Amino acid sequence: MLCWLPVVLQAEVSPELLNGYRNGAESKVVYRVVDDEGNAVSNATAEIWYRSYGRPQDNAHWKTQTNRDGEFVAQHRTNERLSVAVRKDGYYSCRDVVSYFDIKKNSVVDGRWQPFGEKRTLVMKRMLKPVRLDFHDGLDYKKVPEYGVWLGFDLQLFDFTSPYGRGRSDDVLLLFTLIKGKDYLATIEMSFTNNVQAGCYRLKKDMYSGLKTVYRADPFAHYEDSVKFSYVRKFGNPPVSESLGEDEYLVFRTRTKVDEDGDLISGHYGIIEGPLSFVGPGGLSVDCCLFNPVEKDTNLEVMRK
């Protein structure tokens, strides 16, 4: 018996579901691949993996092509998971995972995982106009030089400005607070108020895609001039974090110029990808920071090679 089956046996599950976890059940998913405008993507290469826990004989891996309607089928026996990845020149890859490892969400009927023959749509974003952006990844940690005071931060160089770093432009002001003791509280406030009409807005990543963020910044979006994130750990309770999550990012505008009426003339645009970390000795880090060095250019489709 598989090591996790005693846990399943303690739950109220049907005999068919239990047998599906013991001996596997047939999975079938019909995929349709479309581009970001909804057009079918034919002749794309779909790579399919079936993984079974404790049943290596059911593991499988193969490749196929999407047909003229952008469709392909994944079908095999499993007790755990289906993973697919789709690639084609001129497009960003996309992926999907179907997990059968949840007794509350899954069911088996006649030896088949339900819904058998489920239809799913995958979106392959087109490569439009990738450009070279200044790029800093999550390995670039910045120790917090001082708490309780506003610190200038250069988003292009991803560093504090003088006297704490090599940054040259106060693209955003950062305020860190830290309270240690029986309870622990850490906050970071990001303010763009030193640049008129600068700010940021928050979006969800397209986690399925090789391009998880937007192609371009929206110059007409509502840009918040400040945002605040916190981490609280009260004695005897689990920590509570209100931060930029792994599946989120900020689109920002800074180094703005306005006319005599206060109307926007130009600015620089970029992206801060979560997760945002500002707790602990490591200091400040993000998944990555992108900065378009070309004034007025809203293009954020980064050329990563």
Regions found by a protein language model. Name each.
Residues 40-41, 52-76:
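Short, acidic Ser/Thr/Gly-rich low-complexity loop/linker segments typical of extracellular
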Residues 107-109, 114-118, 123-305:
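Surface-exposed, beta-sheet-biased, low-hydrophobicity segments with strongly acidic/polar composition
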Residues 54, 77-107:
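A short, solvent-exposed loop/turn motif at the edges and junctions
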Residues 44-51, 99:
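Hydrophobic beta-strand segments
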